[in-house]
């Protein structure tokens, strides 16, 4: 992972700490600010290469969607955006897009988990690669806060968790960890650590 990249919510080591040296102790928003861009939402931005990416709601009313947007890190201009629908969800509009996207250090591809439990895979240029509706396939249910888990990239896997109330071997309300192949989106495994969802 190149120094300076922050490919997922808690950084390259998943501990919330930067390896960068010489960072300022206080931000000067008047003298050293390079750019500012209106964005909104609750997602934590990630940095991969010369892109700053985050999720947020886009549109209003019947046109409300979730969006993954990547900005040019040098200028703040929109490099690309990808929108997808939020359905089968009781998440109110102001709580959409809480989770952060994650970038695969090996490919630069971006993975996002929407509030309605939709997983989307995008190329580093914002092209749609695949998607899976965990809500439809595993009866994942949403809460007032939506899905707040950011995808974890582990080797060839994209791992998400969801509270599900499914049937068959995954029956009963529980938290499940669902591992998807990062290239195809195929389900590799579903883990059920036990216990009731909170």
Feature roles, as predicted:
Residues 1-198:
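Noncatalytic, solvent-exposed loop/strand surfaces
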């Amino acid at each position: 992972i190149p120094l300076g990249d922050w490919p997922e919510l808690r950084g390259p080591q998943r501990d919330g700490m930067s390896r960068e040296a010489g960072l300022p102790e206080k931000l000067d928003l008047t003298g050293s600010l390079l750019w500012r861009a209106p964005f909104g939402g609750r997602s934590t931005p990630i940095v991969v290469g010369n892109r700053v990416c985050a999720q947020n709601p886009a549109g209003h009313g019947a046109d409300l969607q979730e969006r993954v947007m990547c900005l040019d890190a040098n200028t703040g201009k929109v490099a690309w955006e990808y929108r997808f629908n939020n359905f089968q969800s009781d998440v109110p509009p102001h709580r959409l897009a809480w989770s952060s996207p994650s970038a695969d250090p090996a490919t630069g591809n971006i993975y996002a988990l929407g509030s309605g439990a939709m997983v989307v895979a995008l190329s580093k240029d914002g092209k749609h690669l695949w998607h899976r509706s965990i809500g439809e396939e595993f009866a994942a249910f949403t809460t007032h806060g939506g899905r707040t888990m950011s995808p974890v990239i582990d080797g060839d896997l994209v791992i998400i968790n969801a509270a599900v109330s499914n049937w068959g071997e995954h029956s009963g309300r529980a938290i499940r960890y669902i591992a998807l192949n990062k290239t195809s989106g195929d389900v590799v495994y579903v883990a059920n650590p036990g216990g009731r969802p909170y």
